[in-house]
Protein backbone atom coordinates (compact mmCIF):
# COMPACT_ATOMS: atom_id res chain seq x y z
CA UNK A 1 0.00 0.00 0.00
CA UNK A 2 1.26 3.43 -0.97
CA UNK A 3 0.21 7.05 -0.79
CA UNK A 4 -0.70 8.38 -4.21
CA UNK A 5 -0.70 12.13 -4.70
CA UNK A 6 -3.24 13.27 -7.29
CA UNK A 7 -1.22 16.41 -7.91
CA UNK A 8 1.89 17.67 -9.58
CA UNK A 9 2.35 20.37 -6.95
CA UNK A 10 6.00 20.58 -5.91
CA UNK A 11 4.91 21.99 -2.55
CA UNK A 12 2.59 19.07 -1.73
CA UNK A 13 5.31 16.63 -2.76
CA UNK A 14 7.84 18.49 -0.58
CA UNK A 15 5.55 18.28 2.46
CA UNK A 16 5.13 14.52 2.11
CA UNK A 17 8.83 13.93 1.47
CA UNK A 18 9.85 16.03 4.47
CA UNK A 19 7.37 14.00 6.51
CA UNK A 20 9.10 10.76 5.49
CA UNK A 21 6.76 9.67 2.69
CA UNK A 22 7.75 9.02 -0.92
CA UNK A 23 4.38 9.14 -2.69
CA UNK A 24 3.45 7.92 -6.12
CA UNK A 25 2.76 11.01 -8.24
CA UNK A 26 -0.30 10.66 -10.45
CA UNK A 27 -1.63 14.11 -11.38
CA UNK A 28 -5.36 14.27 -11.95
CA UNK A 29 -6.60 16.29 -14.86
CA UNK A 30 -9.97 17.82 -14.09
CA UNK A 31 -11.71 20.87 -15.47
CA UNK A 32 -11.45 23.11 -12.41
CA UNK A 33 -13.25 26.01 -14.08
CA UNK A 34 -16.24 23.80 -14.93
CA UNK A 35 -16.41 22.47 -11.36
CA UNK A 36 -16.25 26.00 -9.93
CA UNK A 37 -18.97 27.13 -12.36
CA UNK A 38 -21.23 24.26 -11.24
CA UNK A 39 -20.73 25.35 -7.63
CA UNK A 40 -21.69 28.99 -8.15
CA UNK A 41 -22.95 30.36 -4.85
CA UNK A 42 -21.47 27.51 -2.78
CA UNK A 43 -19.50 28.18 0.39
CA UNK A 44 -15.72 28.56 -0.09
CA UNK A 45 -14.90 25.40 1.88
CA UNK A 46 -17.32 23.42 -0.30
CA UNK A 47 -15.66 24.66 -3.48
CA UNK A 48 -12.11 23.71 -2.47
CA UNK A 49 -13.14 20.33 -1.07
CA UNK A 50 -15.14 19.50 -4.20
CA UNK A 51 -12.11 20.34 -6.34
CA UNK A 52 -9.94 18.11 -4.14
CA UNK A 53 -12.51 15.31 -4.32
CA UNK A 54 -12.75 15.53 -8.11
CA UNK A 55 -8.99 15.12 -8.34
CA UNK A 56 -8.87 12.15 -5.97
CA UNK A 57 -11.83 10.43 -7.62
CA UNK A 58 -10.34 10.92 -11.09
CA UNK A 59 -7.41 8.63 -10.31
CA UNK A 60 -8.62 6.48 -7.38
CA UNK A 61 -9.97 3.66 -9.62
CA UNK A 62 -6.42 3.11 -10.87
CA UNK A 63 -5.13 2.73 -7.28
CA UNK A 64 -7.75 0.60 -5.47
CA UNK A 65 -5.45 -0.59 -2.68
CA UNK A 66 -3.67 2.70 -2.09
CA UNK A 67 -4.39 5.89 -0.19
CA UNK A 68 -5.13 8.59 -2.76
CA UNK A 69 -4.82 12.24 -1.79
CA UNK A 70 -6.41 15.06 -3.76
CA UNK A 71 -5.92 18.66 -2.73
CA UNK A 72 -6.76 22.17 -3.76
CA UNK A 73 -6.03 25.55 -2.19
CA UNK A 74 -7.54 29.00 -2.65
CA UNK A 75 -7.22 32.32 -0.86
CA UNK A 76 -10.36 33.94 0.54
CA UNK A 77 -10.07 37.74 0.56
CA UNK A 78 -13.04 40.08 0.87
CA UNK A 79 -15.42 37.16 0.37
CA UNK A 80 -13.83 36.22 -2.97
CA UNK A 81 -11.89 33.03 -3.65
CA UNK A 82 -8.65 33.49 -5.53
CA UNK A 83 -6.70 30.72 -7.17
CA UNK A 84 -3.42 30.96 -9.03
CA UNK A 85 -2.61 34.30 -10.66
CA UNK A 86 -0.73 32.74 -13.64
CA UNK A 87 0.84 36.05 -14.79
CA UNK A 88 3.16 38.63 -13.23
CA UNK A 89 0.57 41.34 -13.91
CA UNK A 90 -2.17 39.47 -12.05
CA UNK A 91 0.27 38.74 -9.22
CA UNK A 92 1.13 42.42 -8.84
CA UNK A 93 -2.55 43.38 -8.82
CA UNK A 94 -3.38 40.78 -6.17
CA UNK A 95 -0.48 41.76 -3.95
CA UNK A 96 -1.50 45.41 -4.10
CA UNK A 97 -4.94 44.31 -2.87
CA UNK A 98 -3.77 41.94 -0.14
CA UNK A 99 -0.68 43.66 1.28
CA UNK A 100 -1.10 44.76 4.86
CA UNK A 101 -4.31 42.76 5.13
CA UNK A 102 -5.57 39.49 6.55
CA UNK A 103 -7.03 36.67 4.46
CA UNK A 104 -7.79 32.96 4.81
CA UNK A 105 -6.00 30.24 2.88
CA UNK A 106 -8.40 27.32 2.48
CA UNK A 107 -6.99 23.94 1.53
CA UNK A 108 -9.41 21.21 0.54
CA UNK A 109 -8.42 17.59 1.07
CA UNK A 110 -9.92 14.38 -0.24
CA UNK A 111 -8.24 11.24 1.05
CA UNK A 112 -9.58 7.99 -0.39
CA UNK A 113 -8.93 4.32 0.25
CA UNK A 114 -11.16 2.10 -1.85
CA UNK A 115 -14.74 3.17 -1.16
CA UNK A 116 -13.80 5.04 2.02
CA UNK A 117 -13.04 8.72 1.92
CA UNK A 118 -12.36 11.67 4.16
CA UNK A 119 -13.12 15.12 2.78
CA UNK A 120 -12.08 18.10 4.87
CA UNK A 121 -11.10 21.74 4.48
CA UNK A 122 -8.38 23.37 6.53
CA UNK A 123 -8.41 27.16 7.04
CA UNK A 124 -5.37 29.17 8.00
CA UNK A 125 -5.38 32.91 8.62
CA UNK A 126 -2.65 34.78 6.75
CA UNK A 127 -1.43 38.20 7.85
CA UNK A 128 0.23 39.77 4.82
CA UNK A 129 3.03 42.29 5.23
CA UNK A 130 2.68 45.78 3.85
CA UNK A 131 5.13 44.94 1.07
CA UNK A 132 6.66 47.71 -1.02
CA UNK A 133 5.81 48.12 -4.69
CA UNK A 134 9.43 47.28 -5.55
CA UNK A 135 9.29 44.00 -3.61
CA UNK A 136 5.89 43.09 -5.05
CA UNK A 137 7.15 43.63 -8.59
CA UNK A 138 10.38 41.70 -7.93
CA UNK A 139 8.42 38.84 -6.38
CA UNK A 140 6.05 38.69 -9.35
CA UNK A 141 8.99 38.75 -11.80
CA UNK A 142 10.64 35.87 -9.91
CA UNK A 143 7.89 33.61 -11.23
CA UNK A 144 7.53 31.87 -7.88
CA UNK A 145 3.97 32.94 -7.02
CA UNK A 146 2.43 32.52 -10.48
CA UNK A 147 1.23 28.95 -9.88
CA UNK A 148 0.42 29.38 -6.19
CA UNK A 149 -3.00 29.87 -4.63
CA UNK A 150 -3.20 33.41 -3.31
CA UNK A 151 -0.09 34.42 -5.26
CA UNK A 152 2.31 33.56 -2.45
CA UNK A 153 4.48 30.89 -0.90
CA UNK A 154 5.23 30.55 2.77
CA UNK A 155 8.32 28.40 2.42
CA UNK A 156 10.37 30.42 -0.08
CA UNK A 157 10.63 34.03 -1.31
CA UNK A 158 7.05 34.75 -0.28
CA UNK A 159 7.99 34.17 3.34
CA UNK A 160 9.47 37.67 3.37
CA UNK A 161 5.99 39.10 2.96
CA UNK A 162 3.99 37.07 5.49
CA UNK A 163 3.90 38.68 8.94
CA UNK A 164 2.11 35.81 10.68
CA UNK A 165 -0.15 32.84 10.21
CA UNK A 166 -2.74 31.35 12.52
CA UNK A 167 -3.31 27.67 11.93
CA UNK A 168 -1.59 24.76 10.27
CA UNK A 169 1.58 25.80 8.38
CA UNK A 170 1.60 22.64 6.23
CA UNK A 171 -1.90 23.47 5.02
CA UNK A 172 -0.68 26.86 3.79
CA UNK A 173 2.04 25.12 1.82
CA UNK A 174 -0.57 22.85 0.25
CA UNK A 175 -1.35 19.77 2.34
CA UNK A 176 -2.35 19.54 5.99
CA UNK A 177 -0.45 16.73 7.67
CA UNK A 178 -2.94 16.73 10.59
CA UNK A 179 -5.84 16.23 8.15
CA UNK A 180 -4.00 13.40 6.39
CA UNK A 181 -3.08 11.79 9.73
CA UNK A 182 -6.70 11.87 10.91
CA UNK A 183 -7.81 10.32 7.62
CA UNK A 184 -5.24 7.55 7.92
CA UNK A 185 -6.37 6.82 11.48
CA UNK A 186 -9.99 6.63 10.29
CA UNK A 187 -8.86 3.95 7.80
CA UNK A 188 -7.13 2.00 10.60
CA UNK A 189 -3.69 3.06 9.38
CA UNK A 190 -0.83 5.02 10.91
CA UNK A 191 1.30 7.79 9.48
CA UNK A 192 4.40 5.74 10.26
CA UNK A 193 3.12 2.93 8.01
CA UNK A 194 4.18 5.10 5.07
CA UNK A 195 7.53 6.41 6.29
CA UNK A 196 10.48 5.54 4.10
CA UNK A 197 13.08 7.22 6.33
Curated annotation (Swiss-Prot):
Mind listing the UniProt keywords for this protein, alphabetically?
Answer: Cytoplasm, Hydrolase, Nucleotide metabolism
Which superkingdom heads the taxonomic lineage of this protein's source? Bacteria
Supply one GO molecular-function term: nucleoside triphosphate diphosphatase activity
Q: Where in the cell is it found?
A: Cytoplasm
> Which Pfam families does the UniProt record give?
Maf
CC per GO annotation = cytoplasm
CC cofactor:
a divalent metal cation
A GO BP term here is: nucleotide metabolic process
What residues make up the catalytic site?
72 (proton acceptor)
Q: Give EC number(s), comma-separated.
A: 3.6.1.9
Q: What is its main location?
A: cytoplasm
User: What's its catalytic activity?
Assistant: a ribonucleoside 5'-triphosphate + H2O = a ribonucleoside 5'-phosphate + diphosphate + H(+); a 2'-deoxyribonucleoside 5'-triphosphate + H2O = a 2'-deoxyribonucleoside 5'-phosphate + diphosphate + H(+)
Q: What class of enzyme is it?
A: hydrolase
Report the sequence similarity comment from the record.
Answer: Belongs to the Maf family.
State its role.
Answer: Nucleoside triphosphate pyrophosphatase. May have a dual role in cell division arrest and in preventing the incorporation of modified nucleotides into cellular nucleic acids.
What is the protein name stated in its UniProt record?
Nucleoside triphosphate pyrophosphatase
